[in-house]
């Protein structure tokens, strides 16, 4: 499964709020909500986050194997 835990750590490390992403960078609140709920987002949005946060994709998402 894909985890967005790195996304939240990166936001904290860079002192950027979700409000700033929405108001300054035109990220929709629906996209933030999808991330909060662990749902999928597009590769375009992943690219946007990497550009905005000046980070790599591993700072946004990580793969966590299912425990089955």
Can you say where each PLM-predicted feature lies in the sequence?
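A short, Lys/Arg-rich alpha-helix, primarily the initiator
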Residues: 1-20
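Alpha-helical residues within the helix-turn-helix
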Residues: 12, 23, 51
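Short, basic-rich loop-to-helix N-cap that marks the start of a DNA-contacting helix
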Residues: 39-51
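Short alpha-helical DNA-recognition segment
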Residues: 15-33
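Short C-terminal boundary/hinge segments that cap the last helix of small helical domains
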Residues: 54-68
